[in-house]
Amino acid sequence: MQVRDGMTSVVLTVGPGHSLRQAAKSMVERRVGAAVVVDPEAPGPGVVTERDILIAIGMGQDPDQETVGDHLSANLTFASPDWSLEEAAAAMVRGKFRHLVVVEGGDLIGILSMRDIVRVWTGDGATCDIPAAANG
């Protein structure tokens, strides 16, 4: 299976001037953990994740005053839609991140999350029994 088989092609995008609260609200509404940040004046897209927002709030920053552009994930890795899901998962583990922006010919075409990979590998309706958590 390839990245194109698991990626989400309808991507939540925000601008660098959006507040962290606006980005978080959009992520909650769309039930996603990341938004691609598109800045017409920058060379490529960025990503802001729920983790980036939590870190900012945890550091005492005001989510209504802080902008997305100041809290982008560092060291962004882009994936090709032709990568295998194994390659994508390995890149995520090596880079210690949970989302890959998928580009083709320099154009944003999707985003792939760890959840997307697990969904493909287990099937949309994984039917195996989930063991109960141990008490204690």
Model-predicted regions and their roles:
Residues M1-V10, T49-F78, S84-V93, L108-I109, ...:
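Tandem CBS (Bateman) regulatory domains
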Residues G6, Q22-S26, D39-E41, M59-D62:
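Short hydrophobic/aromatic-rich motifs at helix boundaries and adjacent loops
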Residues V14-R31, V38, A79-K96, V103-E104, ...:
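The conserved cystathionine-beta-synthase
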Residues M27-R30, A35-R51, M92, L100-R115:
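A glycine-centered beta-loop-beta connector
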